[in-house]
Amino acid sequence: MKKRIFLKMSSAALAGAALPHLNSCKQVDTPVAPQGGQAAARLKNWAGNLEYSTGNVVYPESVEQAQAFVMKADKIRALGSQHCFNRIADSPHQLISTKNLNKVVALDPAKKTVTVEAGIRYGTLGEYLQGKGYALHNLASLPHISVAGSIATATHGSGVKNGNLATAVSGIEFVTAAGEVVTLSKEKDGDQFLGAVVGLGGLGVATRVTLDVRPSYQVRQDVYENLPFGELEKNFEAIMSSGYSVSLFTNWQKNNVSEVWVKSLIVEGKPATIKTELYGATPAKRNLHPIVELASENCTEQMGAPGPWHERLPHFRMNFTPSSGKELQSEYFVPFSNAFAALKAINGLGDKWIQDLFISEVRTIAADDLWMSPCYKRPSVAIHFTWKQNTDSVMKLIPVVEEQLAPFGARPHWGKLFTITAAQLRSRYERYADFQQLLRLYDPKGKFRNDFLDLNLA
């Protein structure tokens, strides 16, 4: 998940230079100025660690406009809500932002689906669905991210039975390199649909998405403090199954998990069974931020207060608009069966990053059949790192983390920082070659390719 930890520390403590060079972590091409004049000011991502390689950005307000922009361009790349930490959405030539394609197209109660434009944000969609009595199966920790961008990178929430956000997709519409509008559906397009959903922006510009919905539901959120790390060895599955969505937060110090966030469904007529202690962790006495020292007013309500799904499943409130946050993020997915071994390997590194790590979050995600999803064919545990913008130190630590997780076939989050090579990715994704072929099918001349795809899908 490309999540926002709303840090409230001094600018001196958080200061870090922007990183115009980050790809997965490689150099990008020389930026190309728009034709006919001086280059426009360039956008940055929301964390401020990355400046995009061109100020040549177009903002279609209709599918027809998107088609026209794509047909006119020699090279172009789709840009979502700018929440990625690497250059997956970058291009030195031209960017096409879907921020103005942000409406609900149709709600179909009979099929239990909602069709939306690509740039709508999950928080906005959540409010709409709740007003109609419907819900999505899960949300990421930050509700401000766009639907199409989140799907393209397999962004996720938590829950042992919950797939990532892309698993809710039943149909997708995108503009191809030829300017044609293609619609693929789970019902009609089978394997090709499964390859296209987590498309990494390589098949075209997503314009509409159809998502499965369900009746609205209520959730309560309870937080526990100070879970002994050793309890994870025998009780990891029980702990992560103690709610509909469970997250662990730790800085890997003192063999301690500082917080356990348990989000539980409220079933009408069935009293909630909330534990007075959770394998040695005790209930928090107040609302908490994932970093316990920080103020919690931007976090979703805790202390067991019932609320609608879209106000409890995220960690942070929709009505707080995030500003640029001085942080870096990386995340790796390992098989659920290797959970404790992987966590133990990382826990042993804790002393290496005392000065560089804000917090880590551990979540679970159900297996899926989407080709480029990090959870393809395996129930997974996601180990996330929110780093300080100590760029030089962090970029040395990331390969150390990857080395420890390599025995478990760790797959990186596509929108966060990693140095795993294309050869390693190829060995860890069964459908890697099939996806390369799918890219060539829809984009034979590489109109949507960029350095990120060239590096990681060589």
Segments predicted by a language model, with ranges:
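C-terminal segment of N-terminal export signals and the immediately downstream linker at the start
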Residues: 21-68
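Glycine-rich N-terminal segment of FAD-binding domains in flavoprotein oxidoreductases
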Residues: 48-140, 154-159, 248, 362
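N-terminal secretory signal peptides and thylakoid transit peptides that target proteins
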Residues: 1-20, 24-28
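Short glycine/threonine-rich loop-to-helix capping motif typified by GTGT followed
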Residues: 17-20, 260-265, 303, 307, ...
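Activity-critical C-terminal alpha-helical subdomain
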Residues: 408-458
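Structural signature of FAD isoalloxazine-binding scaffolds in flavoprotein oxidoreductases
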Residues: 86-106, 157-179, 205-212, 381
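Substrate-recognition/cap regions that form aromatic- and gly/pro-loop-enriched pockets
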Residues: 313, 317-424
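C-terminal substrate-binding/cap subdomain adjacent to the FAD-binding core in PCMH-type
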Residues: 2, 32, 170-349, 355-356, ...
